[in-house]
Amino acid sequence: MSFLGGFFGPICEIDVVLNDGETRKMAEMKTEDGKVEKHYLFYDGESVSGKVNLAFKQPGKRLEHQGIRIEFVGQIELFNDKSNTHEFVNLVKELALPGELTQSRSYDFEFMQVEKPYESYIGANVRLRYFLKVTIVRRLTDLVKEYDLIVHQLATYPDVNNSIKMEVGIEDCLHIEFEYNKSKYHLKDVIVGKIYFLLVRIKIQHMELQLIKKEITGIGPSTTTETETIAKYEIMDGAPVKGESIPIRLFLAGYDPTPTMRDVNKKFSVRYFLNLVLVDEEDRRYFKQQEIILWRKAPEKLRKQRTNFHQRFESPESQASAEQPEM
């Protein structure tokens, strides 16, 4: 099964074939323009091996070169600064010394137990990608072709996963208690909780729970935060009464979130918040945010193979904000 192929003019076609391409799983990823691409899926520590095939399209042609190489690259690109591209992994295998190609050739390559410290990611302002890069070095213009891979970071957590329970309110007007069953959720998990009204002296017209994603790029004064509402869950439509308790069930599997990503190579972070929103009869909106951790659960087969694998995140911190009076 061919991995990908590309034409470099009428002379030579470059093709990369992975050794386990027929059995390796593939994963999908949305590009910055909203299209969905499918590439081979790898995990941290897995080897990457295969063949680079160079096929001449026209018999009798020659291709002089200054060397042929393949690279395994991990790269972070900030969209608002295309010149600021950072490579956190760059492994090189020389395939051929300077010479001349007169016929089709194949070259074996292998990158052993490659460290892939971060998850592949494409967001509003940043892209983290892994790719194989084949270069035929020439005097004037190199022939270069890139082949994307997708990397997933797997995480396991100890049995302790504390629930979130808070009482919030507006003095003498509204007092509620909310509870979520966990503070850490895997990407296919269900957020279960409840809202309990202790005091209601303002007329609430609408109440919903939002899952908010915040992508933070840059450092210091150049920091940019992009906020996106991933999911909305209507808790109630109408006025609650004192003592009323309303259950919450939000299924994450339907929204395809990414894992939480903390200070990735000091370039960006991706964080998730549960945002409780109340709207009163005068259309004033009240918010209460609570950070949660999202993590990628290993498939059952891999969980058995990776019993020593463990990934930790720092504890989430609660944040609160409001356009109108804070709860």
From Swiss-Prot:
Q: Name one GO cellular component term.
A: vesicle
Keyword flag Zinc: no
Q: How does it sit in the membrane?
A: Peripheral membrane protein
Q: Which Pfam families match?
A: Vps26 (PF03643)
Q: What is its main location?
A: cytoplasm
| Residues modified to Phosphoserine | S315
* Ribonucleoprotein among keywords: no
Where is the segment annotated Disordered? 306-327
InterPro entries reported for this sequence: Arrestin-like_C (IPR014752), Vps26-related (IPR028934)
**UniProt xrefs under Gene3D superfamilies:** 2.60.40.640
| Superkingdom assignment | Eukaryota
Provide a GO biological process annotation.
endocytic recycling
Q: Where is the composition biased (Polar residues)?
A: 316-327
Keyword terms: Cytoplasm, Endosome, Membrane, Phosphoprotein, Protein transport, Transport
Cellular localisation: Cytoplasm; Endosome membrane; Early endosome
The function of this protein is: Acts as a component of the retromer cargo-selective complex (CSC). The CSC is believed to be the core functional component of retromer or respective retromer complex variants acting to prevent missorting of selected transmembrane cargo proteins into the lysosomal degradation pathway. The recruitment of the CSC to the endosomal membrane involves RAB7A and SNX3. The SNX-BAR retromer mediates retrograde transport of cargo proteins from endosomes to the trans-Golgi network (TGN) and is involved in endosome-to-plasma membrane transport for cargo protein recycling.
Assembly and interaction partners = Component of the heterotrimeric retromer cargo-selective complex (CSC), also described as vacuolar protein sorting subcomplex (VPS), formed by VPS26 (VPS26A or VPS26B), VPS29 and VPS35. The CSC has a highly elongated structure with VPS26 and VPS29 binding independently at opposite distal ends of VPS35 as central platform. The CSC is believed to associate with variable sorting nexins to form functionally distinct retromer complex variants.
> What family is this?
Belongs to the VPS26 family.
PANTHER family membership: VACUOLAR PROTEIN SORTING 26 RELATED
User: Mind telling me what this protein is named?
Assistant: Vacuolar protein sorting-associated protein 26A
Q: Which gene encodes it?
A: VPS26A
